[in-house]
Design a protein with these regions (language model features):
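Mid-domain alpha/beta scaffold segments of enzyme catalytic cores
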Residues: 1-217
Length: 217
């Protein structure tokens, strides 16, 4: 597998295998040499969500699918009732635990509900909360609960600078070229860009393997 520098994107990278590309039940072209996650976004849940999730479960078993998601809870933009969002999210959690693949989480104004589900289901494997914009205190509390955060273009600089190096994860999401993000992060860290790329690639490998054993500090 190539070094992965982008833990979550909706676009195919120029160099196959360097980004984890989001697949959905409606978009699941598995091109060779790329790596993927698959999930049902809370904005896209339909009345027949069980059929949608059945497709997710099949795609998730492919060896090039390295993670489950993005999936989660959204109190702001999703028109789907929260009880349905929770039911769908629990199905993703079950898949993550069963297949031993980490979960990429979308969460908007629902952190308490997210943590409650993690506790009630006795989750053993780590999650990553993608597109994190919050402060360093909340990021630390999430880590203690077994949830990494990944930073996109709208990251909080205080969170970046406070974060232990071994937890730094970056993503382009829907914002195109991840190299722009690496340039900004390297400048804020006053670090060599290639060193930051190597660090994040190492951290992504550790995250993907962390279903075996991981301790959060």
């Amino acid at each position: 597998m190539s070094a992965v520098y982008d833990i979550h994107t909706h676009d195919f990278p120029e160099v196959p295998g360097t980004s984890i590309v989001q697949l959905t039940p409606a978009r699941y072209c598995l091109y060779p040499d790329h790596v993927y996650s698959v999930g049902l976004h809370p904005w896209d849940i339909e009345d027949d969500w069980r059929v949608q999730m059945a497709k997710v479960a099949v795609i998730a078993m492919h060896p090039h699918v390295l993670a489950i998601g993005e999936a989660g809870l959204d109190k702001k933009k999703s028109p789907v009732p929260m009880d349905v969002q929770k039911a769908v999210f629990r199905e993703h959690v079950k898949l993550s635990e069963m297949l031993h693949k980490p979960l990429i989480v979308h969460c908007v104004k629902a952190v308490d509900e997210l943590l409650a589900i993690r506790r009630e289901m006795g989750v053993k494997h780590p999650w990553v909360l993608h597109g994190y914009r919050g402060g360093p205190e909340q990021a630390e509390q999430l880590r203690k609960q077994g949830i990494y955060v990944s930073l996109g273009l709208e990251y909080n600089t205080d969170t970046l600078l406070d974060m232990p190096f071994k937890y730094l994860l970056l993503e382009s999401d829907t914002h195109g070229d991840v190299n722009v993000l690496y340039k900004l992060v390297s400048e804020d860290m006053e670090a060599n860009e290639q060193s930051v790329r190597s660090l994040v690639a190492k951290n992504i490998v550790a995250f993907l393997k962390s279903h075996d054993e991981h301790s959060f500090e």
